[in-house]
């Protein structure tokens, strides 16, 4: 609410909230799930007025994801993985407390910065919660986003196998060079608790 409230004047914000409670049929009685309902409400086009920021829905979704990670009861596993395993030869294991998002630079939006037109290229954001329980974000590029997606979608593949798929998709001829780049990225992800290591069934 804090960011959305800061980019809309008080009357417009109150009118939007009032329309949400008056017109939207919430499907949940749980307070922590109200932000998800608000995103659904905005996505339907209800309550929107001419002059509203074009990124309002994306901002609401981003703040909802922050809340989801902050309130999640998921925990980092204590066993069942190699914290220092080889991220290319073995099977990388992702933290359950991360999400890859793409849209406006909503993490930078404030009263002074409100982009009015879409970016020429998609902006990718990685939002995650570390072992210290703090939710953070980082901007990533499209190949990094795809690398994480491939690991998530192919839990039985080694890092090398995932990189091979990425190289084919990108039409990148030098797989070894891409593997070297990817290893640096994966090591950074492990340092940030986005990767917790490698599975025990691998090296």
Regions flagged by a language model, labelled:
Residues 74-101:
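Short, conserved active-site entrance elements at the starts or edges of catalytic domains
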Residues 91-153:
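Low-complexity, glycine/alanine/valine/leucine- and proline-rich hydrophobic stretches
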Residues 1-83, 133, 138-203:
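Long, charge-rich, low-complexity alpha-helical segments
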């Amino acid at each position: 609410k804090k960011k959305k409230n800061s980019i809309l004047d008080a009357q417009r914000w109150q009118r939007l909230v009032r329309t949400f409670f008056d017109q939207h049929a919430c499907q949940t009685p749980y307070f922590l799930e109200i932000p998800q309902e608000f995103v659904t409400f905005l996505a339907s086009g209800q309550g929107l007025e001419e002059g509203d920021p074009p990124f309002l829905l994306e901002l609401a979704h981003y703040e909802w994801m922050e809340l989801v990670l902050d309130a999640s009861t998921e925990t980092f596993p204590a066993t069942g993985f190699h914290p220092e395993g080889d991220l290319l030869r073995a099977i990388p294991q992702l933290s359950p407390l991360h999400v890859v998002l793409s849209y406006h630079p909503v993490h930078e939006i404030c009263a002074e910065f409100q982009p009015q037109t879409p970016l020429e290229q998609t902006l990718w954001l990685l939002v995650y919660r570390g072992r210290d329980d703090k939710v953070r974000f980082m901007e990533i590029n499209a190949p990094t986003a795809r690398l994480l997606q491939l690991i998530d979608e192919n839990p039985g593949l080694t890092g090398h196998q995932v990189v091979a798929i990425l190289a084919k998709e990108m039409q990148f001829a030098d797989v070894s060079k891409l593997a070297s780049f990817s290893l640096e990225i994966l090591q950074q992800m492990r340092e940030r608790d986005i990767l917790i290591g490698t599975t025990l069934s691998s090296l």
